[in-house]
Amino acid sequence: MGLPKSFVSMSLLFFSTLLILSLAFNAKNLTQRTNDEVKAMYESWLIKYGKSYNSLGEWERRFEIFKETLRFIDEHNADTNRSYKVGLNQFADLTDEEFRSTYLGFTSGSNKTKVSNRYEPRVGQVLPSYVDWRSAGAVVDIKSQGECGGCWAFSAIATVEGINKIVTGVLISLSEQELIDCGRTQNTRGCNGGYITDGFQFIINNGGINTEENYPYTAQDGECNLDLQNEKYVTIDTYENVPYNNEWALQTAVTYQPVSVALDAAGDAFKHYSSGIFTGPCGTAIDHAVTIVGYGTEGGIDYWIVKNSWDTTWGEEGYMRILRNVGGAGTCGIATMPSYPVKYNNQNHPKPYSSLINPPAFSMSKDGPVGVDDGQRYSA
């Protein structure tokens, strides 16, 4: 026997009312903030980030941008179905063009090395279900590129710092400024953007790289200090590219070392990301270089652990978790152009993450990984 029409109508009315109340509650920040309250928030934000505007009309112009950013944040976070949050950070009163031209410095183009088969998927290959090179001591603290499009240098240096630690056991913070000042090429122009692989090639050609302490970061282009360039503390042997658009190969590579990648970071959601697993929206027009330092799964959602160079005020203390295993180019194009430095030890290649955390379960040869560990198995 069916339910009475009056009962069905009352039920629909009840649930519709609940939905309206829920939306109203979630949108309360949008409707209850007065202009004076938002102004007070902006003044506090200006103090926090050390900003001030003195030219006529500039404060008012920036305040309008801030208000729109706050509206975007409130609308995004009101949706409880989203897997990540956004928030106010140092970019809150920048226009999209200012943000892109200042902070996105990856120059896309053809890579100059052939793709290596070192991390090609192998039938039956099993990878750890979780990797975090931070816990293995192979990741230097978050750095800030400042108002310089030198993300390519930060990504290259982060992977060199990582492989050096994995091979030698010593973690040394290295000099991005040396790459920016001394590593210029036709396509790599310091704070005006560049190739990650040009950074690797400079270190190889130079016979090494200096430390951050000796050649400190200035967030601007400078003349190459030849005396400091000749102080070489860390070397690499070569660099290679992970097979393109292949997240399993990328996962294999990250099992053995941090990996440089580029992605599309131009959208508002990426710019204001604060926590959770980022799922977009974003495209695949890669414009920003970062470093993958691990991967994992939370609540059934696979993710990459990404180290950025926008200070600890962005994201999860400077890091982002971004959706993994979506196929093709990956979320925001993260699997489009991965690359990594190679530094040989007596066994020709570093040990994987699992052997540094637990008893060794892999062995390495110059041709690639051999062996298995607990985790995810690849099948063709």
Curated annotation (Swiss-Prot):
A Pfam family it matches: Inhibitor_I29
Any Gene Ontology biological process: proteolysis
PROSITE patterns with a match to the protein in the record: THIOL_PROTEASE_ASN, THIOL_PROTEASE_CYS, THIOL_PROTEASE_HIS
Record-linked SUPFAM superfamilies: Cysteine proteinases (SSF54001)
Disulfide bonds: 148-191, 182-224, 282-332
Alphabetical UniProt keywords: Allergen, Disulfide bond, Glycoprotein, Hydrolase, Protease, Signal, Thiol protease, Zymogen
SMART domains to which the protein is assigned, alphabetical: Inhibitor_I29, Pept_C1
Primary enzyme class: hydrolase
Coiled coil ranges: none
Highest taxon of source: Eukaryota
Prosegment residue ranges: 25-126
Transmembrane segments: none
Catalytic residues (UniProt): 151, 288, 308
Similarity comment text for this entry: Belongs to the peptidase C1 family.
Stated role: Cysteine protease responsible for the cleavage of kiwellin into kissper and KiTH.
Name by which UniProt lists this protein: Actinidain
